[in-house]
Amino acid sequence: TGMRKIGVIAQERSHGTGVWGPEHHELTAERASSFAIRNLPILTLMDTPGADPYEAANANNQAHSISRLIAELCNVDVPTLGIIIGQGYSGGAIPLAASNLLLCLKTGVFNTIHRRSLANLVRRYNLSWQECAKFVGVSSFELYQQGNIDGIVDFDPGETSNIHHFLTVLVTGIESIESGARQFVAEHPEILDHYHRNITRYLTPHEYLSAVNASSTLKLRTSPTEYPNVFGVAYRYLRYLGLRKRIKATTTTQYGRLAQVDIPEGELAQRVHRERRSAFLSWL
């Protein structure tokens, strides 16, 4: 299809270990909106141990900045492709994972729990880090099996022989999102009625809608040139369906003590004791 421009949002662990504060989330939300206004597909690359959990970040409304970025990336009317290239933990990765298509490199890890919380699970349930990772399910293969990601890329950062796999995914991933939106519009003409209602509200907004738009922190389209087409509406709707599919729900009964899944019984303490005893006996 020839050369195309895309917007890239990436986390870099060599700078501040990839930890984002409120200022990073706010800037990213602005960039995402800017890309969408220019009709540029958005690529997000996740590699972070999590959002900044310290007092200064929370004092600057860290939680709100994360929520705003999630809302902005869910609201854009262009294809969004998310790829986990390394670590993807907690609020640092969740916003960038709000994409039409979510992929993971074969050595990538992803979880909504912060690393410190995982460490608490290790101590609480007497688990080794390997056992904790197994029960929680953070590897790319476990994530795919659980339905939390859409695919695995056969590439590891630093490899040169498989770099074409990564480059191919960038192209085919965006093309598949666009193909899916085109097929959805063709098979569901009712979306045209929905789009027509959107146009009507844009041309003749109600006073209450105008008041809501005036107080919104999301970037709203004000000029006809920037206004999304029907495929932009399809991207948003299909993204919502994809995100809804990844979210798992449970009842209080299933979550409580009567749950069918037993609490894992770790053997970390026993294993450490055996190793220390073996070392002591060999020293004797």
Q: Where does each model-flagged region fall?
A:
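Intrinsically disordered, low-complexity segments enriched in small/flexible residues
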Residues: 1-6, 10, 15-17, 167-284
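Glycine-centered flexibility motif
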Residues: 18, 50, 88-92, 232, ...
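Glycine-rich phosphate-binding loop at the start of an alpha helix
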Residues: 22, 26-29, 90, 137
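Short, solvent-exposed loop/turn segments at secondary-structure boundaries
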Residues: 19-22, 56-58
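Conserved catalytic cores of soluble enzyme domains
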Residues: 46-192
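A structural preference for short, pocket-lining loop segments at secondary-structure junctions
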Residues: 1-15, 25-53
